[in-house]
Amino acid sequence: MVGNRHPTHDRRPTSGTTAALADSLTGTSDPAPPRVWVMMGHKAGDNSQILALAEALGWPFEIKRLVYRPTELMTNLLAPRTLLGIVRRRSSPLAPPWPDLIISAGRRNEPPCRWIQARAGKPVRLVHCGRPWAALECFDLVVTTPQYRLPQRDNVLHNLTPLQRVSAARLEEARALWQPKLAHLPRPHVAVMVGGDAGPYVLDAEAAALLGRAASAFAAKAGGSLLVTTSARTPAPAVAALAGALDGPHELFRWGPDAAADNPYFGYLAVADSFIVTCESMSMLAEACSTCKPVYMFDLDTGPQLRWPLLTSLIGEVPATSFARRLRRLRFQPLVYRTAMVTGPRRLTRDTRIIQGQLIAAGRAVWLGQDFPPGPPPVPLDDVARAVTRVKALTATADDHRIAAE
């Protein structure tokens, strides 16, 4: 529910003076946690990151949902601290009591967050996940990943993968729910996480059908089954082609806005023995890698470096790329991406090949059709813990300044 605090109780005293008096009388000191606002955006991957950080901090937090105007890009470029880019009557209220900490992601949220800082009349720490559009100096902390190629700065935390909400407790809960439901399928379970178009990557019917064939062959070779899930970005023609190509024991979850309660995503993460993930989704790759199980990336590129020939050992033939698919390289989104990579400012572009390469170098993933090199399994990711440590250091500094002022 919009504006609800998690958990619902709030241990915050009415004033710092009251809290200090109570502490002096009882001989204890239990400072209230900072007031945290989580600024939800329009991208599932961004929202997953900021919720992961908010939950891991262990403090109560308030979710703010914003509805953006079609003109938000223009107004936000003209006024870096403004609410002109949002529809205020349809958005969560942005009013006192102001937060001590804002966790946000995405270009559209930056002007409202900076507007809050200007209005609050007190220090408000701003933590941004991903790649900011404003200058890095505008943020107290930027939690970023390799594809954005941000410079080394004191207020920039470079992680290997995007923050994700996978935890041991969440996986155990999901396993208890979904393992009985999937017990009829032979093991090993191979989870297939399907994304969609992004940057230079195109998930058309041709690619989806090949993914279905290759994943089916992969599971059959191991004597196992597939646990397949699409996502909000998966085009309908790709879903149909994927479903038609699946062979052998499998479960297919077709994502839909009305199917959230039955979404088996965390269940698949919990019970799967290995993963096949479309390579454009950094969030799904991070979530799969967080399990420390084998992760195989399926290439969706439309360029000459496409890695489909690696699938020959699975499907028994060299996968052909149709002329129509090669033409899709010239579609608007892939063309804009490639043009921006050549002519655009470096800090406003991203190169997902960097994070893919680092996952391979760290022994956490390989391309589908390749074998994992010998060696021990990877150690658990510590990206969320690193971010929590940095944020708590920020707020501790803010508390010291507040106490000194009192």
Where are these regions (language model features)?
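Donor nucleotide-activated moiety binding/catalytic core segment of transferases
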Residues: 242-284
